[in-house]
Amino acid sequence: TEDTVTQLRNHTDRKIIIRPHPLYRKSSLHSNLREKVLRVADVHWQEADVRKPEFIPIAEQLKKAWCTVTYSSGTGIDAVINGIPNVACDSGSMVYEVSSKEISEVEHPFTGDKSKWANKIAHCQWSIKEFESGECWEHVSKSI
């Protein structure tokens, strides 16, 4: 995160909001990292604990977002589905094929067609009935 913030600041003057993984807040490294990244100009730390009043849901923050920068986070999926460009820093990201790949692209992120990707993602969702009928396994087992 620290390196990512530094790289981002080299490529944009926009406000940077860090949204740590909700489980990360339990780590002892959490406060040290928070202190380090907040030293960088115009960097903000979003509270990850949903029980605290300063928590803002991702859907709310995306309404004001220019772009998201993720590794393999579900936030990238939320962003892309809501029309917000993403920079995917990890090839394992579910939005890798519809994202910019380099932090240096943050000011001009990928905004191309995502319909093929959306169709593929839609086929990753299964109902209980499809699990029970074996349809899900029939589809998934071809990839193993």
Protein language model features and the residues they cover:
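Well-ordered, non-membrane alpha-helical segments in soluble/globular domains
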Residues: 1-8, 30-36
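Short, acidic/turn-prone active-site loops that include or flank metal/cofactor-
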Residues: 48-51, 91-96
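Flexible glycine-rich beta->alpha loop in the catalytic core of nucleotide-sugar glycosyltransferases
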Residues: 74-75, 85, 92-93
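Hydrophobic anchor at the start of a short beta-strand
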Residues: 14-16, 43, 86-87, 115-124
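Donor nucleotide-activated moiety binding/catalytic core segment of transferases
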Residues: 14, 22-77, 81
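Short beta-alpha junction loops
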Residues: 20-24, 91-94
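Leloir-type glycosyltransferase catalytic cores
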Residues: 97-144
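Short hydrophobic beta-strand element within catalytic cores of glycosyltransferases
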Residues: 68-69, 85-89
